């Protein structure tokens, strides 16, 4: 895939970025260079290579996936003007 001047101008317009003619011409070369590098990366054989999250092997820290109320209901509603059994009471807004 290659980028031409019209594509650069269209993307700049969609992104609402003011780009002069000189800048647009320079960006054509830069974007084509980036896309060329990405195409080179797609040629690399990565079959059998395990995905990495870091350059050093480490286990991800995980917490237990448990649903709790946080045991802080009283603290949460402490500053509310009106509550009932740890629920906020608000005025009725729909008839």
From Swiss-Prot:
The gene is gatC. GO terms for molecular function: asparaginyl-tRNA synthase (glutamine-hydrolyzing) activity; ATP binding; glutaminyl-tRNA synthase (glutamine-hydrolyzing) activity. GO terms for biological process: glutaminyl-tRNAGln biosynthesis via transamidation; regulation of translational fidelity; translation. It holds the Pfam family GatC. It catalyses: L-glutamyl-tRNA(Gln) + L-glutamine + ATP + H2O = L-glutaminyl-tRNA(Gln) + L-glutamate + ADP + phosphate + H(+); L-aspartyl-tRNA(Asn) + L-glutamine + ATP + H2O = L-asparaginyl-tRNA(Asn) + L-glutamate + ADP + phosphate + 2 H(+). Allows the formation of correctly charged Asn-tRNA(Asn) or Gln-tRNA(Gln) through the transamidation of misacylated Asp-tRNA(Asn) or Glu-tRNA(Gln) in organisms which lack either or both of asparaginyl-tRNA or glutaminyl-tRNA synthetases. The reaction takes place in the presence of glutamine and ATP through an activated phospho-Asp-tRNA(Asn) or phospho-Glu-tRNA(Gln). It is an enzyme of class 6 (ligase). Keywords: ATP-binding, Ligase, Nucleotide-binding, Protein biosynthesis. This is Aspartyl/glutamyl-tRNA(Asn/Gln) amidotransferase subunit C. Belongs to the GatC family. PANTHER family: GLUTAMYL-TRNA(GLN) AMIDOTRANSFERASE SUBUNIT C, MITOCHONDRIAL (PTHR15004:SF0). InterPro entries: Asp/Glu-ADT_sf_sub_c (IPR036113), GatC (IPR003837). Heterotrimer of A, B and C subunits. Its EC number is 6.3.5.-.
């Amino acid at each position: 895939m290659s980028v031409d001047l019209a594509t650069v101008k269209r993307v700049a317009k969609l992104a609402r970025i003011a780009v002069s003619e000189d800048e647009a011409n320079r960006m054509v070369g830069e974007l084509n260079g980036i896309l060329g590098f990405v195409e080179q990366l797609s040629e690399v054989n990565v079959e059998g290579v395990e995905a990495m999250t870091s350059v050093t092997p480490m286990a991800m820290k995980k917490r237990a996936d448990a649903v709790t109320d946080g045991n802080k209901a009283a603290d949460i509603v402490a500053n509310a003007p009106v509550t009932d059994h740890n629920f906020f009471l608000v005025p009725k807004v729909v008839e």
